[in-house]
Amino acid sequence: FGRGGRGVYILTDIPDLDAMLSSKPSHVLSQKYFRDLLYAQDIFEDLIVMEELHPPYHSSYTLVQKEEVCTLDHIREWGSASQTFRGVVNYDKDIENFTKILAREYNLEYTFNIELATNSQGKLVLFDLNPRIGASSGIDKDLGVNYPYLSLKLLLGENIELIYKNILNRRFVRYLDYVWSD
């Protein structure tokens, strides 16, 4: 997970260069290689170093209306980073309560997206907070929650009313269609 635009790498003990170059996925680096790289630099950009996280990976989208939030959670089953091919959409009260706290603490008054994954103790850990909804939120329109449209309504100062807390274990599959061209 997390390669490409997110710039996330897993540091591990890899015995030599051949083992590193032949290892997959390619977002795994040896600790020695990374340490030597850092020591060789005079100036480098800020880094965030955190524990290794594991599936399930969650991407939750939130609309904020005054003191209330509307959050749906997407759990990735197949895919990587923002390219989730198959997943499950749920209303999760605990995650929604967490997003309510985030909205209050970080003064998030419109829309946002959080990414969560599981640490080695089995607890969900926040590893990304985006002050916007992601493009993937558009798939929820078929479940009655059209995030892009509702975001525009909020922007215009209109109230929104949603029935979404009954959305449980709704599986989606996407990007698997054929397009023919001459």
Q: What are these model-derived regions, one by one?
A:
Residues 91-182:
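ATP-dependent carboxylate activation and anion-phosphoryl transfer catalytic cores
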